[in-house]
């Protein structure tokens, strides 16, 4: 079931990259004059004290575009809602799934994979369960260095 390894985040370092629009059609001559800088921490980490990253293992979320080897940024300060992709601690393991709250009034919630080859987990009131955080960003490496 476990399909994510939680890692501590060191968001104190500054990673600044030159920003350039990536055009899928014809490039604009005005792009030569853009000099905005991307600060990963400023632009993507809203709650540094509550943010972590996770290494994704497995393919249970592949139909959501999350693949084995990806990294996700998890924010524990964000409130999960129905349909959120969450990292949950359930029965002693971390797992990443869609949170389905449609049956909450009936006493259970569901953790839904984004791959039909995996089962839906029904989480009952007495289960050892916690929504540990909400997945807010995905990082994928296309080219290995």
What is the predicted function of each stretch?
Residues 1-62, 93-94, 108, 129-132, ...:
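Short, positionally conserved secondary-structure boundary motifs
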Residues 63-64, 72-73:
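Charged, well-structured alpha/beta interaction segments
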Residues 94-126:
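Aromatic- and Lys/Arg-enriched surface recognition patch
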Residues 69-70, 84:
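Structural motif
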Residues 52, 82-105:
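Short, compositionally biased
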Residues 73-74, 87:
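Hydrophobic beta-strand signal
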């Amino acid at each position: 079931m476990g399909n994510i390894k939680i890692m501590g985040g060191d968001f104190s370092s500054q990673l600044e990259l030159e920003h350039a629009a990536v055009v899928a059609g014809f490039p604009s001559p005005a792009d030569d004059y853009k000099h905005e800088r991307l600060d990963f921490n400023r632009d993507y980490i809203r709650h540094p004290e509550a943010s972590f990253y996770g290494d994704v293992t497995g393919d249970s979320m592949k139909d959501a575009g999350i693949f084995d080897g990806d990294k996700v940024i998890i924010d524990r300060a964000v409130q999960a809602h129905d349909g959120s992709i969450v990292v949950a601690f359930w029965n002693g393991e971390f797992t990443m799934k869609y949170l389905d709250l449609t049956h909450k009034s009936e006493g259970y919630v569901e953790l839904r994979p984004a791959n039909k080859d995996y089962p839906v987990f029904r989480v009952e009131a007495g289960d050892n369960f916690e929504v540990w955080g909400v997945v807010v960003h995905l990082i994928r490496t296309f080219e290995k260095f």
